[in-house]
Amino acid sequence: MQVRIKFSKEGPMKFVGHLDTMRYFQKALRRAELPVAFSGGYSPHMIMSFAVPLGVGMESLGDYFDLEMAEDMPTAEIAARLEEQMAEGMHIVSVRKVEDGKAGKAMALVAAADYLVEFRPGKEPSIDWKSRVKEFLAQPEIKVTKQTKRSEKEIDLRPNIYKMEVRENGFFYMLASASSNYTKPEMVTNTFFHWIGEELPEFAFTVKRLEIGRAHV
């Protein structure tokens, strides 16, 4: 039995990195005494896979991991027992069974992610930036230099921006999130303001991931 677990990560837990989040859930699953399936071999480990890693300092209302169970049990019981082990800022949103024939690694199912970017108090630019978004998106290309592990390369951001909408105090984004074209909302935001001639101060805005999944544009 494979289940897909949706969880939120807010408050102090946003400073816990991806690898530590994985370890956190491994410990929580053991404390919950759930019948989790393990791999074979000399070093068995829980059979689980997480979706797109969340950056340190970013909150999320919709993150996922897939978990292989050694035996069937009600998803409501899995959710309740795991929720009892959650610390402040971490919450189990839902647990659902992955139907036979549709199982797969959570990461492989991700094509897009929704984000909310909001300016911190006193950090919103004083210039009229909201009226410039349509013009920014109308560009056939949005070239930026992306830093990789070994070098720099120029990429076109425009195909990776599925949605960019103005909110009262920031932006709503739907951005590409597959492993081949993962796009950070911070990069899009800073690129936009650089394009209109406004450089944002450090820590000008917060980022919250709302949901991940297939692109629904």
Show where each model-derived region lies.
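Ordered, amphipathic secondary-structure segments that act as subunit-interaction surfaces
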Residues: 61-116
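Short, charge-patterned binding micro-sites
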Residues: 37-69
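Short amphipathic alpha-helices in soluble, non-transmembrane regions
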Residues: 77-86, 128-137, 188-189
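Core RNA-modification/binding signature centered on pseudouridine synthases
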Residues: 134-216
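Short, low-order "capping/linker" segments at domain edges
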Residues: 102-121, 159-163, 214-216
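Short beta-strand-to-loop capping motifs
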Residues: 7-9, 67-73, 117-123, 173-177
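Extended, well-folded interaction surfaces typified by the phenylalanyl-tRNA synthetase beta subunit core
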Residues: 6-8, 12, 16, 20
